[in-house]
Amino acid sequence: MQRKIKSYVLRAGRISNRQQQGLDLWLEDYELKFDSPSPWNFAKEFGRHDADTIVEIGFGMGTSLFAMAMNNPQCNYLGIEVHKAGVGSLVADLHEYQISNVRVVAHDAVEVLQTKIPENSLAGVQIFFPDPWHKKRHHKRRLIQSEFIQMLVKKIRPSGFIHCATDWEDYAEHILNVLSSESALFNQQKEGGYSPRPDSRPLTKFELRGERLGHGVWDLVFIKK
C-alpha cells in the first residue's frame, strides 16, 4: 500500500506543562522507535509472552486507551498518534498511575503498519472517532478505505477484531460498506449493520456531551475469519 494522501493535518497546537513533561521526562519509558531496523517483537517490547496485543490508531488525548489498559492488564496496548499534545498527555497519565502495558509510537499509522507490525500478530485494532473529513471533496483523506482495511486484515490474527466508532453517520455508512466488502471479515452483528457500544469501549466526555445533545454514535465490530 503506497501512502500518498494523509488522513490528518499536523497543526501547531498549545502543549500544556504536564504534556510537555510527558514528552520530555517519560516518553522514552513507553515509546517504540519507528526508526528501529526491523519489525517489532511484542514479547520483547512489552517484556512478556502470550499477551494479546491491541493497537489503537489515533488515540487523541489517550482517554479511552488509558482506561482500557487499566481495565485489562492482561493485554498489551500499542497506541499510534501523531499529535504531540495527545502523546504527552497519555504518557503523563501512564507515568502517574504506573501503567506498564501500554507502548506508544508517534508516527503515521499507515507507515507503522506497513513496516513495523508483523503479520497475524494483533488480537485487534481499534479506531475511535477518526477525522470524518466531512466535506465531500475531502473524503479521499478518510483513513478507512478498502486498501487500508486489506492491510489491517493481514496484521490481525484469525478471530481478531477491527472495532471502529464514529459520530458522523455518513462516515459510519462508508465504514460499514468498506468492512462488509472485505471477504476476510464478518460482522459481529449477525443481522448486519451496527453494533451496540461494547462495554470494553469507555464513554468519553466528548461522547457524553454529544449524547446529551442528541448526537448519534455508531460502533462497528468485524472479526477476521
Curated annotation (Swiss-Prot):
Pathways per UniProt: tRNA modification; N(7)-methylguanine-tRNA biosynthesis
EC number: 2.1.1.33
Keywords, in A-Z order: Methyltransferase, S-adenosyl-L-methionine, Transferase, tRNA processing
Signal peptide: none
Residues reported to bind S-adenosyl-L-methionine: E56, E81, D108, D131
Cited SUPFAM superfamilies: S-adenosyl-L-methionine-dependent methyltransferases
Catalysed reaction equations from the record: guanosine(46) in tRNA + S-adenosyl-L-methionine = N(7)-methylguanosine(46) in tRNA + S-adenosyl-L-homocysteine
Entry-linked Pfam families: Methyltransf_4
Residues binding substrate, per UniProt: K135, D167, T204, K205, F206, E207
Molecular functions (GO terms): tRNA (guanine(46)-N7)-methyltransferase activity
Annotated disulfide bonds: none
Residues at the catalytic site: D131
Gene Ontology CC, one term: tRNA methyltransferase complex
The keyword tRNA processing is annotated on this UniProt entry: yes
Broadest EC class assigned to this enzyme: transferase
Entry similarity comment: Belongs to the class I-like SAM-binding methyltransferase superfamily. TrmB family.
General function of this protein: Catalyzes the formation of N(7)-methylguanine at position 46 (m7G46) in tRNA.
Name listed for the protein in its UniProt record: tRNA (guanine-N(7)-)-methyltransferase
Taxonomic source organism: Legionella pneumophila (strain Lens)
